[in-house]
């Protein structure tokens, strides 16, 4: 799906074209971290053989404390040793009885329980804008949100910012070093936001493409995207408040081709000894409603069970809109219950296969039906927190102008949708 629309930037005199936020249009349709003292019950399926969520608890040699008896692991990258810990412990090979990764810096991570969503936040768009002008000019074609703007969302109760950006700007040439200026913008935002206790979800907003060439093709082999992620993971592996989102909305490719690329990228991330949580999308714009459908090829629900994370710390990211074709281009929502309905099959898949999910994009205009649909959707996610880890609204950011889904405040005034989200931020 393509959600392109004109926008107004305060720093730019003319109207510009925004980069497309994503979505999951389906042609078959007609119409932050949790603290060490978290005491929620462990999800039975969350083991090292399925989709666990491990959040960093302590750095090498540091002491830590857990409430009750919890599963803690010690290591780095893909090398770990697990231990059931009651009370206090220390992030050392002596305490865990083994050095799983000799010669590298290690951390201790806590296996997260269920019952409370880990992340609730918003995509702050801007750095992915101007996709027709790559790499483009900063301040004219695209903009990073300011770290200060995140304070508004934090004060509302959000603890996660999803940051869309373009691969081509960060790495203008495949397999080569990152552009210093773009890297500075990216790391500056991430470091400032995570320093306040927020989590940042990195989102290469490229639809599984680089200058229009699909990942897994001869022009953009899997090894090139693996190189990108190896470099990016190295930048942020010491920051446990950074989540690595593999890609925004892969589409129009064999699902098997996307799986191959995703597995290559996961291997590259873990080879950099990065222990961060990784969010993995599916094919077909990673639509929740179409996860088990075959109109785009072999269903995600079949193929993505072949995912292989050597670090055993992944979450599946899906997107879901509420209009007739799930594209997120309409102000109308199908019904007050459509959001929960469209998440149902994916939720069953998560639970049946021992995985966890994150609702990485959803949004709607402000009207009675849509407000009810959003509320029912978020209630559904909350009530299924044994497999759901959280959500991020699409979108906020400085250049949206009158975009119907935007929750960026206008002159300090909340957008109407914020009142719908507010009960789920307590």
From Swiss-Prot:
Enzyme Commission code: 3.2.1.4
Lineage: Bacteria, Pseudomonadati, Pseudomonadota, Betaproteobacteria, Burkholderiales
Propiece span(s): 20-45
Catalytic activities: Endohydrolysis of (1->4)-beta-D-glucosidic linkages in cellulose, lichenin and cereal beta-D-glucans
Name of the top EC class for this enzyme: hydrolase
Family: Belongs to the glycosyl hydrolase 5 (cellulase A) family.
Domain of life of the native organism: Bacteria
Alphabetized InterPro entries for the sequence: Glyco_hydro_5, Glyco_hydro_5_CS, Glycoside_hydrolase_SF
GO BP: any one term: cellulose catabolic process
Protein's name according to its UniProt entry: Endoglucanase
Residues anchoring lipid (S-diacylglycerol cysteine): 20
Organism: Ralstonia solanacearum
Gene3D superfamilies xrefs: Glycosidases
Signal sequence extent: 1-19
Location, primary (coarse class): membrane
């Amino acid at each position: 799906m393509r959600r392109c629309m004109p926008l107004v930037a305060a720093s730019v005199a003319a109207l510009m074209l925004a980069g497309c936020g994503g979505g999951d249009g389906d042609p078959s349709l007609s119409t932050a971290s949790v603290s060490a003292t978290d005491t929620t019950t462990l999800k039975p399926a969350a083991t090292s053989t399925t989709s666990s969520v491990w959040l960093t608890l302590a750095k090498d040699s540091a002491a830590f404390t857990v409430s009750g008896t919890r599963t803690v692991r010690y290591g780095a990258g893909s090398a770990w040793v697990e231990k059931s810990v009651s009370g206090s412990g220390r992030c050392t090979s002596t305490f865990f009885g083994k050095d799983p990764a000799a010669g590298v810096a290690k951390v201790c991570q806590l296996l997260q329980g269920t019952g409370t969503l880990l992340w609730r936040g918003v995509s702050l768009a801007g750095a992915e804008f101007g996709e027709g002008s790559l790499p483009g000019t900063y301040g004219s074609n695209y903009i990073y949100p300011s770290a200060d703007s995140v304070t508004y969302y934090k004060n509302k109760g959000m603890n996660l910012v999803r940051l869309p950006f373009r691969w081509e700007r960060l790495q203008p040439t495949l397999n080569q070093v990152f552009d210093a200026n773009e890297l500075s913008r990216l790391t500056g935002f991430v470091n400032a936001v995570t320093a306040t206790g927020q989590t940042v979800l990195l989102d290469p907003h490229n639809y599984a493409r680089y200058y229009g060439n699909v990942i897994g093709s001869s022009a953009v082999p899997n090894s090139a995207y693996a190189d990108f992620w190896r470099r990016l993971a190295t930048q942020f592996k010491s920051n446990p408040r950074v989540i690595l989102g593999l890609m925004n909305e892969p589409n129009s490719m064999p699902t098997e081709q996307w799986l191959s690329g995703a597995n290559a990228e996961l291997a590259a991330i873990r080879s950099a000894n990065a222990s961060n949580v990784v969010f993995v999308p599916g094919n077909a714009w990673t639509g929740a409603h179409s996860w088990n459908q075959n109109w785009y090829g072999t269903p995600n629900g079949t193929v993505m069970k072949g995912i292989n994370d050597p670090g055993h710390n992944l979450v599946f990211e899906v997107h879901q809109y509420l209009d007739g074709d799930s594209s997120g281009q309409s102000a109308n929502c199908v019904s007050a219950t459509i959001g929960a309905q469209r998440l149902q099959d994916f939720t069953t898949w998560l639970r049946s296969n021992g995985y966890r999910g994150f609702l990485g994009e959803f949004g709607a205009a402000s009207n009675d039906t849509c407000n009810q649909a959003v509320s029912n959707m978020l209630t559904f996610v909350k009530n299924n927190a044994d497999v759901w880890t959280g959500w991020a609204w699409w979108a906020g950011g400085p250049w949206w102008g009158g975009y119907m889904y935007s929750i960026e405040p206008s002159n300090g005034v909340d957008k109407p949708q914020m009142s719908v989200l507010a009960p789920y931020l307590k």
